[in-house]
């Protein structure tokens, strides 16, 4: 995996953006998003996407409680 800071920041930004779309109820086809990635990038990206989805859902639940 290319561990350059710029590359990781770009992938992280994309994972966060797609997680936000998912949290807003917009359809996200994560297989289409990661289709051209090699296995290492896909694994890293999907882990970050899942983490951001979890964070955004927790934030939404907290908002609904108050």
From Swiss-Prot:
Gene3D superfamilies: Glycogen synthesis protein GlgS (1.20.970.20). InterPro entries: GlgS (IPR015065), GlgS_sf (IPR036295). GO terms for biological process: negative regulation of bacterial-type flagellum-dependent cell motility; negative regulation of single-species biofilm formation on inanimate substrate. Disruption phenotype: Deletion mutants show increased flagella and fimbriae production, are hypermotile, and exhibit increased biofilm formation. Induction: Expression is dependent on RpoS. Belongs to the GlgS family. HAMAP family: GlgS (MF_00525). Major determinant of cell surface composition. Negatively regulates motility, adhesion and synthesis of biofilm exopolysaccharides. This is Surface composition regulator. The lineage of its organism: Bacteria, Pseudomonadati, Pseudomonadota, Gammaproteobacteria, Enterobacterales. The gene is glgS.
């Amino acid at each position: 995996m290319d561990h350059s800071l710029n590359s990781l920041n770009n992938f992280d930004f994309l994972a966060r953006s797609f997680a936000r779309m998912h949290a807003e109820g917009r359809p996200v086809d994560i297989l289409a998003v990661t289709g051209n990635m090699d296995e290492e990038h896909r694994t890293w990206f999907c882990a970050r996407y899942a983490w951001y989805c979890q964070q955004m859902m927790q934030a939404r639940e907290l908002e609904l409680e108050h």
